[in-house]
Amino acid sequence: MSSKRQFFKHTLIFGVGGIVGQLVPLILLPLYTNYLAPTEYGTLDLIALASDIINTVFLIGGIRLAAMTFYKQAESEEARRRIAITISSLLWLAIAIAISLSIFFIDYLDLFLKTGQKEILACGLAITLLEGLVTVPMTLTQARLESLRFVLTNLAMAISRMVLCIYFVAGLEWGIWGVLYAQAMVTIVFGILLTYRELRLGSIYPDTSKWREILLFCLPLVPNGIFAFVVAASGRVSLLHCGPYEGEAAALGAVGLYALASRLVSVTYSMGVTPIQRVWTVEMYDVYKTPDAPHVFGNFLLRLLCVQVFFALLISLFATEIVRTVCDRSYHDAAALIPLFGLYLLLTLFATQMSNTFFITRKTNYNLYCTALMLPFVFLFMDLLVPRWGMMGAVIAYNLAYLPYIGIMYYLTQRLFRVCYPLGKMALLLTITVLCYVLSLLCGSGVELSALSIDEFSALSREEKVMDAWNRIQWLPNIAKMGIMFLWGVLVWFSGILSQEDKALAIRVCKRGLQKLRLLP
């Protein structure tokens, strides 16, 4: 494994880039939630959902995972250059086939997703699938631990997309088409540039004999990806087809609110966990070979959990304030879903980290078994909860279904590679977090509801809506919630959850950051 200094250096760069990069989607959320109706936001979410299953079926997602694994396990620089162009050429073929067949069967996809807009669905799918031209070169950049290049490229793409979205959606008022045009321009331009760079770095000719080995690696991921898609899509599909809503427009609007809550919480995951995971997924193959690997893997999950719990608690405490301040009134009901999505991401974090064992040991078929065993629980809880409770029932159903899934995965991964998880410390961390969240409920909302009717509020200009939201802010509840966040940090610090090494590292990082800002000598 690289030195700890190198590990934290790359993590810091990925982290800063992740935070800055996620600011762009956060800036775009008010744009989407004020210029797009919930039905349009729901349509964008369904396009992303459909592209996920297409990526899985046509191995586009699997090829991205293969890029990291095969590149890191290549034994020479020449082999790494050859594997880069080999994987890229296979990816181009997969994308071409996927786009062609998606457009051919667009009528059936639209019938299932109930968007009522086949042209938007077809264009959206083609544009989203083309993002594979960006993801694989970026995966190879990550594998080389070119963290600064990775972050700057991501940042350039995010800022370009933000500027184009603002111009097309707010300036030209093109609505959902403006979002798609901005995505298409950024994807095509950066896809060409990144692909050209990989061609220069790698071998000119692909090793097609490796295609079979790559496909054999990816194929077990297809049924697992399909099962994972069914799990991920069941909430949206249940809302569309059996939710307690009158009419397709109301159901599609519910999907939009559901997608907004999911998006807000996933931003915290991207800012907190994703930068660390980008380094860890490269380093874990080397750690696996060391004698203290079981303890390193277990302690790493605890640290990762601390980071995600902090961000999940933060956004859960201020969920109502965020949604009421930055979103149009038609999106306000999404705030109630955010704490439940925070819990869902914590469960996802457990499962994701345990599933790394399957990739290290090349037993990806076990991942399939775990996901397949989860499906009956998802269907059962969705059938019981969604018809009665709608969006809230869908998120609760996911959380309930994940509990047996994690139990099954824990049993299988421990048989392949026994990890020493600090379960007691994890339980204490979650207990402290739940108590702090319950305490925050006593504080009330930090932003009052508008006294205006829906028609009066809709008649306001954008500037008047912002001023109305600002005037409704209640400072005392917000200060109390910030105090609860501070209390959470104190309890975690002094409860023994963090080791002395973790505390010393945190102090060094904070001190170095203050010195960089010239706040300390």
Where are these regions (language model features)?
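Interfacial segments at transmembrane-helix termini and the short loops linking adjacent helices
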Residues: K4, I106-G124, I315-T352, M392, ...
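Alpha-helical transmembrane segments of polytopic membrane transporters and translocases
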Residues: P30, G42-L59, A254-V273, L302-R303, ...
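Helix-loop junctions and terminal segments of transmembrane helices
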Residues: L59-E75, A143, A261, V265-L305, ...
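N-terminal membrane topogenesis motif
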Residues: M1-L26, E78-A79, I85, T208-N224, ...
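Signature of the first transmembrane helix
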Residues: Q6-L65, A96-I103, I127, A158-M162, ...
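Hydrophobic transmembrane helix module of multi-pass membrane transport proteins
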Residues: V20, D52, S89-S234
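Interhelical loop/hinge segments that connect adjacent transmembrane helices in multipass membrane
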Residues: M1-F7, I176, I192-A232, V279-H295, ...
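Membrane-proximal transmembrane or re-entrant/amphipathic helices at the cytosolic face
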Residues: G444-P521
